[in-house]
Every structure is written in C-alpha cells, then in structure tokens.
Amino acid sequence: DEPLDSKHNEWLMKNVLSDGGQFTGVSDLVTKYGLVPSTVQPETYNSNNTRKIDELIILKLKEYALELRAMNADKKAKKDKLEARKVEMLSQVYRMLVLAYGEPVQEFTYTLRDVNGKEISTETYTPKSFYEKYVGKDLKNSYVMLMNDPSREFFKIYEIENDRHVMDGANWKYINLPIEDIKKIAIESIKDSTMMYFSCDVGKFLYS
C-alpha cells in the first residue's frame, strides 16, 4: 500500500535481485532443497553467463510488481484473485529459470569412487538425502558470519534487511569485528582444518 515512489519501494525496484550472495543464503538454500554433484546437473551456458537471464528476470519481476499493484488498487479486487495471479507469475518466472538452467533434479544415482577411480558404492539419492549424507552438518546453526565494517561499531551484531535467498530464510546477519581479530580466527581455522568461507568487496577494482 506504500506509494510507488516511497523510499522502501524505490529501493526494492532498484534491487530486484543480485547475482551472488553470502553464506546465510547458501545455508538456507541447501538446507531446504539439498545438493547434487556437478556430474548430475552440469553447468549450462547461462549458468556461466548469468547477466542476460538476470536482466530478463528483473524486467519480468518489475512488470509483475506493477501489475499486482494495479490489481490491489482496485477496491473490488479479492485477495484470492491476487494470490492466484501471483502463482501464475511465479510459474512463468520458474519456466524462464528452467529454460536457462535446466529442470531441478528430483532423484539421481551416484557412484562414489576412491582416488584411483575404484567404485566404493552406488546409491540413489534425492538432493536432500545427498546433502544429509555427504555434508550432514547443520549449516544454519553451526556457523556465524564475521565481517569487518569500519563504518559501524565493532563487537556488535548487525542484520541487513531484505537480504535473503528464500522467503522463509534468514537475513544476512554478522558480527562486526576488527580485521586483526578476523585474521587471527582465520589462522586458527586453518590450523584445525576447519574451512572458513571468505569473501571481500572487490567491485571497485573490477574495471581499474
């Protein structure tokens, strides 16, 4: 019901989706849907060159947002009609994604081999059962995100609104620490063979 030119809606229309993300989003996705080996669902041209499909999805979502706003502005519009139309819209977006990336795998057979290529076992999995067997950890509750943001006070937890990969997932939440502390934690994680996910803001260097 907010005006289209409100600060909130203006931000949403400028940030429809982003091609990337962070650990919270990944943990939400794999916990909900699972994982498959790349041999089961290989990369496509579009998964290696995502800009064009991103642009098409963004345009389609903006179009749908304006249509839903117009329907909602009609006093006679019923909620069930709005919901039904939204489902139709999401079905079209899903179709676009499937055409670009392929239909999500529901079940597959996977052969585990040793370093010499000798077969160890062959089993049938769903993406969820594969994730549970070969990852197993509770990614959503076993890890925390650390960040070095000098523009904000250190030793506090921050949450980024509307930064999530799934609607029922969690926003990007992190503990803000001095870079010296993060370096020490990174060194300790290497020493005890615990993998540490790492990313950095390099956008300003891409075209320098």
PLM features: what roles do these ranges have?
Residues 1-208:
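Structured alpha-helical subdomains that flank or immediately precede key functional sites
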